[in-house]
Amino acid sequence: MGASSSSSVSEKSIHQFTVKDSSGKEVDLSVYQGKVLLVVNVASKCGFTESNYTQLTELYRKYKDQGFVVLAFPCNQFLSQEPGTSEEAHQFACTRFKAEYPVFQKVRVNGQNAAPVYKFLKSKKPSFLGSRIKWNFTKFLVGKDGQVIDRYGTTVSPLSIQKDIEKALAQEL
């Protein structure tokens, strides 16, 4: 784990972070207070792209009116499987998979230059192999209060976590 574990993250909630959208505009994540979030590092040229994007879109459409939002963060750290610009990644998700949820600016999810929001997520829910994200489409379920509920690896399909999403949506703030 090393020095960059939870001790280097002072934020207590995902709502304390500001990120950039695919065009570079700042987005304060406090706008998602009271919503259940599924934060995912996405890639357009991965073997898991088709199934994950399709199911993320399905989940978003099914639960968005109940306060569920997918936050997609393109990442090129795994075999350069998101080689284009942030805008190209956004266009890909929206055109090919009809994504209506936010697709943010490309980020690093591991290492010294990892996005602060990802340092937070990993510090709150390390996997059994440590906090490092192993591959594209790692998913973090975040409750209405901005706390990380669970972390799901690449091979966990988005549709398989519907019960967890429903449980989080049913919780009071």
Curated annotation (Swiss-Prot):
Which keywords does this chain's UniProt record carry?
A: Cell membrane, Lipoprotein, Membrane, Myristate, Oxidoreductase, Peroxidase, Stress response
The molecular function terms in GO held by this entry are: glutathione peroxidase activity
Biological process (GO), any one:
response to oxidative stress
Tissue occurrence:
Ubiquitous.
| Main localization of the protein described in the UniProt heading | membrane
Could you tell me which residues are lipidated, with the kind given as N-myristoyl glycine?
Answer: G2
Q: Which domain of life is it from?
A: Eukaryota
Q: Which reaction does it catalyse?
A: 2 glutathione + H2O2 = glutathione disulfide + 2 H2O
Q: Where in the cell is it found?
A: Cell membrane
State the EC number(s). 1.11.1.9
Question: How is this protein positioned relative to the membrane?
Answer: Lipid-anchor
Task of the protein = May constitute a glutathione peroxidase-like protective system against oxidative stresses.
**Family indicated by similarity:** Belongs to the glutathione peroxidase family.
The identity of this protein, by name, is Probable glutathione peroxidase 5
Which organism is the protein's source?
Arabidopsis thaliana (Mouse-ear cress)
- Gene responsible for this protein: GPX5
